[in-house]
Amino acid sequence: MPPKKQAQAGGSKKAEQKKKEKIIEDKTFGLKNKKGAKQQKFIKAVTHQVKFGQQNPRQVAQSEAEKKLKKDDKKKELQELNELFKPVVAAQKISKGADPKSVVCAFFKQGQCTKGDKCKFSHDLTLERKCEKRSVYIDARDEELEKDTMDNWDEKKLEEVVNKKHGEAEKKKPKTQIVCKHFLEAIENNKYGWFWVCPGGGDICMYRHALPPGFVLKKDKKKEEKEDEISLEDLIERERSALGPNVTKITLESFLAWKKRKRQEKIDKLEQDIERRKADFKAGKALVISGREVFEFRPELVDDDDEEADDTRYTQGTGGDEVDDSVSVNDIDLSLYIPRDVDETGITVASLERFSTYTSEKDENKLSEASGGRAENGERSDLEEDNEGEGQENGAIDAVPVDENLFTGEDLDELEEELNTLDLEE
């Protein structure tokens, strides 16, 4: 009797995968919905440790890249085999009534058609690109009506046409040249094509499915507007070049004269508008006017308001909590706003030697201050000079009191003993 086969120690791959998922779920219980970076990093580390053990993340990424390369190699091999052995092409089917010569032969595309000129399908690979596109400026229903003449009608068809043309339902139906909104939306959103069906009833839609001549779409308008846009600098340069060379130079006098003329034109226009509105108000034409205009057009209303006002006098009590805020008020001097030319007389430019001498003096001062020798070099800071000046003005210089018994002989002896007994580490 042969010995029994030993069961696999590791078990099946599915069982191992379930165990790993169970361990990951137990260790990350309650942390999956946490959005913190630490929790997400911990979950990622636990998942990697359970799935790949102590394997390096670089090795895992390398193994995945190798698997991907193997898949790509297999795909390339299949493509090469298909090109070499030419797989079987399914029989071609076309819809009833369609012209076979308008369809490219599938076997000819693969290079397997042996019929040649006898093949009922077309062998012209450019035929698909030569197909007529559907025009958005022509309604296909109009063409069908033009081709559908009385020569091809029978008695039943004739009755149907008469009922449609002169029937009561057709008379009640409004005739319109309005373009269908669904048709326009489909064109604007690039959804219009051979298989597009109008949501408003398909071929029964009462509105036209063709654009009128000269109609411009919104997307084309936006493109034209973007092309017409120019920058502010280009606009200024274009306007300047259009003025020509014979122009008046702008000076203070010409600018003030232009400003005065514009201001006077504005005042005249405002007065004309007020006179016109006043005439409309008197004639009863102005229905909407402001309260200010009412009192301007009828000043007598101000006196009427004073007569109807309350004559009661109120005395204002002086409270103890009032604070007297004394604020200095300065009158506006209009002479400050008078434009003037810049007076360039008397303006001088400093020479380069002055700047070089000034910088050298500053560098010397900084050097003496850094070396701590201001007293030796006979230099003093601005602060010392100010303090000295203040002291001389007061008539005496305040001396700093010095304690002469601060360092006696006993203190110095104790200091020397401490220095001698101090252990110095090298």
From Swiss-Prot:
Keywords from the named record? Coiled coil, Cytoplasm, Metal-binding, Nucleus, Phosphoprotein, Repeat, Zinc, Zinc-finger
Question: Per the record, which residues fall in region Disordered?
Answer: 1-30, 53-74, 299-326, 358-411
Q: What is its main location?
A: cytoplasm
UniProt superkingdom = Eukaryota
Entry GO CC: cytosol; nucleus
Report the InterPro entries cross-referenced here: ZC3H15/TMA46_C, Znf_CCCH, Znf_CCCH_sf
Composition-biased stretches, type Acidic residues, lie in 382-391
* Coiled-coil regions listed: 61-86, 218-285
A Pfam family reported for this protein in Swiss-Prot or TrEMBL = zf-CCCH
- List compositional bias (Polar residues) regions by residue number: 53-62
Q: Zn finger regions (C3H1-type) covering which residues?
A: 99-126, 174-212
Which sequence positions carry the modification called Phosphoserine? S231, S351, S360, S381
From the Swiss-Prot or TrEMBL record, what is one GO molecular function term? Answer: zinc ion binding
> Where is the segment annotated Required for interaction with DRG1?
236-260
Where is this chain's protein located in or outside the cell?
A: Cytoplasm; Nucleus
PANTHER family membership = ZINC FINGER CCCH DOMAIN-CONTAINING PROTEIN 15 (PTHR12681:SF0), ZINC FINGER-CONTAINING PROTEIN P48ZNF (PTHR12681)
Q: How does it assemble?
A: Interacts with DRG1; the interaction forms a polysomal DRG1-DFRP1/ZC3H15 complex which provides protein stability to DRG1 possibly by blocking poly-ubiquitination.
Family of the protein in this entry = Belongs to the ZC3H15/TMA46 family.
Task: Describe the function of this protein.
Answer: Protects DRG1 from proteolytic degradation.
Which protein, by its recorded name, is this? Zinc finger CCCH domain-containing protein 15
Q: Which organism is it from?
A: Bos taurus
